[in-house]
Amino acid sequence: MVYIANGQVLDGQSRSPWRLSFLTDMFWGITDFIVMFFQSIIHPNVTRRGCQNSSSRTRFDDGRGPPGNPRRRMGRIDHNSGPNAPPMSGGGUGR
């Protein structure tokens, strides 16, 4: 990848992939993953905002609030009219 450093255009291929900053970033990334993995097993109801008990958490904790009214009127379900259900396929006798 091409990048600019100190006003010069440099090619990314000249940098070593095993430089110290890459190794330290990789180490801390793996360490954070392992710590978060075991924390999620030990305390599964901990979120970024802290511990969330099921009793203290409401349905609309994300700040959006309850949904509004439907935009159009829904039709009434009428069980007395309409076509009959199709017959079951396969028949009987284990076929």
UniProtKB/Swiss-Prot annotation:
One term under GO cellular component: plasma membrane
Main location: endoplasmic reticulum
A Pfam family hit: SelK_SelG
Name of the molecule in the record: Selenoprotein K
Topology term for the membrane: Single-pass membrane protein
InterPro entries per UniProt: Se_SelK/SelG (IPR024491)
Domain of life: Eukaryota
Entry function: Required for Ca(2+) flux in immune cells and plays a role in T-cell proliferation and in T-cell and neutrophil migration. Involved in endoplasmic reticulum-associated degradation (ERAD) of soluble glycosylated proteins. Required for cell surface expression of CD36 and involved in macrophage uptake of low-density lipoprotein and in foam cell formation. Required for palmitoylation.
Family indicated by similarity: Belongs to the selenoprotein K family.
Originating gene: selenok
Transmembrane spans: 20-42
Keywords of the record: Calcium, Calcium transport, Cell membrane, Endoplasmic reticulum, Ion transport, Membrane, Selenocysteine, Transmembrane, Transmembrane helix, Transport
Chain spans, region Disordered: 48-95
GO BP: calcium ion transport; protein palmitoylation
Places the protein is found: Endoplasmic reticulum membrane; Cell membrane
First and last residue of the signal peptide: none
